[in-house]
Every structure is written in C-alpha cells, then in structure tokens.
Amino acid sequence: MKNYTILFPGQGSQSIGMMDSFSTNTIVKSTFDEAAEHLKKDFWSMVALENSAIHQTENTQPIMLISGIALWRLLGSLGINKPISLAGHSLGEFTALVAAGVISFTEALDLVTQRAKLMQSAVPDQVGAMAAILGLEDEAVVRVCQAVQSDEVMEPVNFNSPGQVVIAGHRNLIEQSLDSFKEAGAK
C-alpha cells in the first residue's frame, strides 16, 4: 500500500447503526467492552440500536473515540503498513493521539468524557442547540444567521467542508430558522 494519512472524525459524524458492519468482529467488540468497563456505560447499544442517546454530547464524544480506536485496532490486525501521519478533526484529535501512542485509550476516554461534560455544562439544558446546514455556501449561511437574529443569538461556528456549516445558538432561534435555511436552498 502506498503512503497514506488517517483523519479521525469529530462529533457530528455519528449515526445509529454506524458500526453494524463490525458487529461480529472481536476486535471492535472488545474495544467497546473495554470502554464500557472503564466508563461503566454500554456504548455498543447506543450505536447498534435505535437509541437517541447516541446524539447526546456526553455519549457522542466517547462513542466517536471508541469507534475510531476500534477501527484503528482492526486496521492494525490486518497487517497493513502504518500511515505516515495521523490527524483528527476537533474531537478526532484525541483518537489520533491514542493511535499515535501519545496517550492511552483509557486516558483519552477520561479526557473526552470530561470534555463532553464541560461542553454540556457550558449551556443550560435545553437553551442551546447546534445544527449542521448542508448544501449552502458559507456566505449564505452567514446571511441567514444575520437575517434571523433577534434578542437571541445564532452564529455559524464550524465550517466543516464546502456545503457543510454548523450553526449554534439559542435552541428556539435555531429551530425557527430551519425553514429559512431550506428556503435558501439547504437540504
């Protein structure tokens, strides 16, 4: 295999059933079991079953780390040469650090769990929200955010890729603005 780099994803790329193809793989399952034992939480059921808990920050962040390390370990078991570099998008940086041997898996689980708790506590429950806006140019997302501003706040906070911008702010304003984004051409 030629030289390659692995980029581990951040929060927002999770989905129910995302690990279904690996449900019988012992390496993947043992990685989830290791995390479950360390954090006393069954993350496998959140990715395998219809469980909305996968979208709660306190679960999503460990799930993304666990999934990334499970696939990293699986890749290593296949005898494929190691990548020339590792990187992570946002939360994925922790996965890259574990894969590079900088920190242990359990250290990363503890750090990511604390990170998720801090992020969740930064905004009172049910006050804030985030949404990924797909299919619009960055400038169009900015314009819609500015057009719907009121006493509440909503801003683009993460320009993930062309056509994918994450907005964050007051939950009510985000929910009310979704139609405006669709009218502007969002999917």
Where are the predicted features?
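Gly/Ala-rich beta-loop-alpha elbow adjacent to hydrolase catalytic centers
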Residues: 68, 84-92, 96, 104
